[in-house]
């Protein structure tokens, strides 16, 4: 079981490395889970946009990264919380507020992949996938 068996950790690492190298986008193997996470990142202004494309019978997701006026990444940190080796579940009441509410928590819930404040409002908990700020 290498690193790549954790596709979410792989996504976060690929984004982190691409931002440090000032790349415009990353291409990553598509999955519904990863698309749901990236869609939340886009809604909260952490990535510019994304698209899903077929290439050599493989579905790829291209994620366009976002930089501020000063060419600095708008993302300061991406932290994987729950891991295949150690799952982390939280109730709605225990969903963390991230970085003075400037960041987000992403959860996998019975109602789908949700951002923390949305899950809190719906009063659903779930697996705490990652934190972004």
Curated annotation (Swiss-Prot):
- Put simply, this protein is called Small ribosomal subunit protein uS8
A GO molecular function held by the record: structural constituent of ribosome
Listed disulfide bonds for this chain?
A: none
UniProt-listed InterPro entries = Ribosomal_uS8 (IPR000630), Ribosomal_uS8_CS (IPR047863), Ribosomal_uS8_sf (IPR035987)
Subunit structure as annotated in this protein's UniProt entry: Part of the 30S ribosomal subunit. Contacts proteins S5 and S12.
Keywords, alphabetical: Ribonucleoprotein, Ribosomal protein, RNA-binding, rRNA-binding
The record's listing under PROSITE patterns reads: RIBOSOMAL_S8
- One GO-annotated biological process of the protein: translation
């Amino acid at each position: 079981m290498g690193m790549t068996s954790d596709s979410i950790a792989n996504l976060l690492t690929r984004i982190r490395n691409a931002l440090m190298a000032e790349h415009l986008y990353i291409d990553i193997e598509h999955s519904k889970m990863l698309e749901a996470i990236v869609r939340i990142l886009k809604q909260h202004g952490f990535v510019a946009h994304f698209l899903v494309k077929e290439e050599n019978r493989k579905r790829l997701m291209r994620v366009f990264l976002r930089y501020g006026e000063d060419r600095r990444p708008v993302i300061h940190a991406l932290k994987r919380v729950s891991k295949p080796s150690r799952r982390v579940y939280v109730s709605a009441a225990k969903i963390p507020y991230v970085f003075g509410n400037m960041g987000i928590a992403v959860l996998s819930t019975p109602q789908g992949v949700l951002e923390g404040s949305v899950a809190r409002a719906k009063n659903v908990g779930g697996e705490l996938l990652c934190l972004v700020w």
